[in-house]
């Protein structure tokens, strides 16, 4: 439910184009997402796919740093919730766990995270994410996201 009269009801699903616009807006306004170089591959209501181009800056020493994969999964998970909440609210990660399934040793290409909301709640949402490289799963993550007032 929205908190102010006349505001959009965030419990109502968005169409695909609205969700895509919301996430492109979020990425454009988030300095960390720009610094990391996240690219929006796709977005729909309560689901987001992001990519992260690989490079030497993400390597430690011969594999992609786990923190890069963790961060990508976290961003995709938060953004999946924001497809429904933005611009009225923000979401923050309360908890995230990740399982690294195999190393990524390439210095070129991209890792891709697909996140979808398993349960969208009034305050708390539960999200699952999969990180892939060249179509193979390299990590899976689960997170808990909390709806927050949007910073002004």
Question: What are the functions of these language-model segments?
Answer:
Residues 52-54, 100, 147:
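Hydrophobic residues in beta-strands and at strand termini
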